[in-house]
């Protein structure tokens, strides 16, 4: 399963990536909402984990944008 993780706190992001990879997930990590939106527009993911408060764009705004584009990827905020 391929996931996108958007978390602006690097240490937390690194820890979550390590846990997810240890459990056999493929993970791409980004550190702001704008990058999360760009990744979700450019590629197919099985799920996305979004931080609610991030630089450039918050998780709710990312979710609204991807839903407006018709992307129904499962999202955890």
Residue positions per predicted region:
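Two-component/phosphorelay signaling modules centered on CheY-like receiver
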Residues: 10-28, 42, 68
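Acidic catalytic/metal-coordinating carboxylates
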Residues: 32, 58-61
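Active-site residues of response regulator receiver
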Residues: 51
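Alpha2 helix of the CheY-like receiver
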Residues: 34-41, 64
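Short amphipathic alpha-helix used as the core "switch/output" element in two-component signaling
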Residues: 60-71
